[in-house]
Amino acid sequence: RVAVRTHGHGLRGRAGAASDGASAELALAVGDRAPWAPALDGLVLRVPTGGRTCVMGASGVGKSTLLALAAGECAPCSMVFQDVRLVEDASALDNALVCADARVDASSAAALLRLLVPGVDVHARVAELSGGQRRRVEIARALLCPGDAVILDEPFTGLDTAARDACAEVVLDLLDGRMLLLATHDAVDARALNISDIITL
């Protein structure tokens, strides 16, 4: 059983945020029955409006949990999950467009996919793609989704240095003032995204 409590004004990006950003107090309790054991309590996460923040730590310290709580506070937002979540039988293009802004047409989405995944057949089923290609399709989907924040949970897993750096460059080019929240165990990922605001768990 999990109980979540949040307080504050939420982690908003451009819309509805104070000029210096916003914060949320996050709490998480776990257990089989009440009283539940606190796993996270009184943590205030502040991300500047349009800013870039990294949550860093080893596997199992709660980075994904923290990002999931933050995602609930900053909706609407887009997210790249640690475990790739795509529709296997749908095409790369259909997956990229699944929550895209209505102003995004298929040709624009296809161009982004080809930029992130050089040589990809955008009409190929996701099941036919490699793990690294799937990861980049998910990054494309997140960038095409509307919202005030982009949340990335270990987004470069399985990518080599060149692919990571190329993806990071595209992410930075397309943020368009949105808040960026990254979780990673590798400081190189934060540097690739020009993040200097780092929280260590």
Which stretches of residues belong to each language-model region?
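The feature captures the beta-strand-to-loop junction immediately N-terminal to the Walker
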Residues: M56-A58
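Conserved ABC ATPase "signature" region
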Residues: H9, A106-D121
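Conserved ABC ATPase signature
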Residues: R125-L129, Q133
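ABC-family nucleotide-binding domains
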Residues: D153, D160
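Q-loop/switch helix immediately C-terminal to the Walker
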Residues: D83, D89-A102
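Hydrophobic anchor residue at the start of the ABC signature
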Residues: I139
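Walker B catalytic motif
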Residues: R125, E154-P155
